[in-house]
Amino acid sequence: MEEGRRGDREAKSAAGWTALSTTKTTLEEKRRLQANGSVGGDAGTSGFRRIVRLFFACMVAGGIQYGWALQLSLLSPYSQTLGISHSYVSLTWICGPIAGFVVQPIVGYYSDRCTMKMGRRRPFILVGCLIICISVMIIGFSADIGRHLGDTKEHCSTYTGPRWSAAMVYIVGFWFLDFANNTVQGPARAMMADLSAGHHGPNVGQSIFSLWMAIGSVLGYLSGANGKWHEWFPWLKTAACCDACANLKGAFFTAVLLIVVSMTVTMYLADEMPLDKQDVDTSGGGGCAVFVDLFKSLRNLPPAMFKVLAVTAVTWLSWFPFIQYNTDWMGREIYHGEPQGTAAKADVYDAGVREGAMGLLFCSVALGVTSFVIPKLCRRLTSKVVWSISNFLVFALMAVMVAVGMVSMRGYRPSLAAGLTGPDPTLKAVALVVFALIGIPQAVLFSVPWAVASEVTAEEGGGQGLAIGVLNIAIVVPQLVIALTAGPIDGAFNKGNTPAFGIGGAFAFICGVLALIWLPKTRGVSNAAVVAGGH
């Protein structure tokens, strides 16, 4: 009897998070009607036309991912040109985990209950896209704004010192950008589930979403690797904004254009059915109740789920050095550039950053290809073996990056002739190969942990909402740890990226062992890898 009562309590607790992130059964019926009637068209509409319309209704995901790719590849290096030291760059990224943990659940809660005539999801997509456009313009023009707020009037081609006003403007824009990204992505993904619920099914909707994210990533990294924006549009250059800064402006101008176009297409084609006020589920107690119920559910998680959370946390600890410093490593260790050095040094650094963006493009391609293979591998080898192998591969690739960085810097001295600056062709080629290969374990990172968590919670009576909620905690906490400790570690090793990659490789090796020992045997996997990692 006691076991039965305990099982009831656990089932209720596990269902709590899911209940807060979904609507009543009548709403699910409306979702199916909406999919059949709006995007799907009438009964006479061909299946091909329905799927094409559904495809373009998700176009906003590509526009958002384009901007996210620019953020990942260009903003850590750019922040250092404004005077933010290498050891404090990680602190500018601390808003990511905060936004992912706080904004997404709250936006998801209220988008499920929105009764505007535009629909449940489109109001949040519209507002989020507008904030993203404003944010990227603030970032792109931060140097010019800082000059008007009191920064040096010396020309950017000769000035090598900090520009603190510009740095503060940049940080404000960066934080707004992260919060806006999280405002859009949750409702956009939920809308695809709404619109595909009838004719196509949720797997088709999520596949289209992932495909648009892949397209956005490839185009974004191509834009970041382009060093011709300042030549095509000379007016981008100002006394406060030289070549590298002007290239950043040009890339972000295209981001605004793509976001506006993709948002307009989505707003037009995704004809949502408005939600009636009487159908709104008001039993949750408000958006903040999401977090209360989530933490209550932690008390009744199955033991296997705690092991999944631990392995997930260590896995993400191994990845953050690469995610934050990938293009900076290419600019510093491989190209021997300096973001706040002389004009020649800054140009070399910028060339390395753009080469790193090209490497991230290769990474995205490898990620997309690998995502199609992962389900078969998981069914054949089990998910935990695939997860473990991916961590050992990260360990090997991080070791190669450490070795390449050390070899590149060993014979280099800044005081030597200018002919020694720039990359060694062989080392540059190896670095690009590493960037491409790391897309393979990244595909595992963005799919397998979610699938394992979903299976473990489902076996104990929980749901997808519970799995996503608790797994977010395991991702957010290590991000905060890295953001707060990366500075002191960086200072202890004289501002290089190589030690950070060494630490990441050590965590990857530990996680590879833990995955084999701790994780349960599961063979399922999510439908497609998510191209955008982290928060």
Curated annotation (Swiss-Prot):
Residues 1-53, 109-122, 185-203, 271-302, 376-384, 451-465, 520-535 are cytoplasmic. Responsible for the transport of sucrose into the cell, with the concomitant uptake of protons (symport system). May also transport other glucosides. Its main location: membrane. It comes from Oryza sativa subsp. indica (Rice). Keywords: Cell membrane, Membrane, Sugar transport, Symport, Transmembrane, Transmembrane helix, Transport. GO terms for biological process: sucrose metabolic process. Homodimer. It comes from the Eukaryota. This is Sucrose transport protein SUT5. InterPro entries: MFS (IPR011701), MFS_trans_sf (IPR036259), Suc_symporter_pln (IPR005989). GO terms for molecular function: arbutin transmembrane transporter activity; maltose:proton symporter activity; salicin transmembrane transporter activity; sucrose:proton symporter activity. Gene3D superfamilies: MFS general substrate transporter like domains. It is found in: Cell membrane. It holds the Pfam family MFS_1. One of its GO terms (cellular component) is plasma membrane. Pathway: Glycan biosynthesis; sucrose metabolism. Residues 75-87, 144-163, 225-249, 324-354, 406-429, 487-498 are extracellular. The keyword Calcium does not apply.
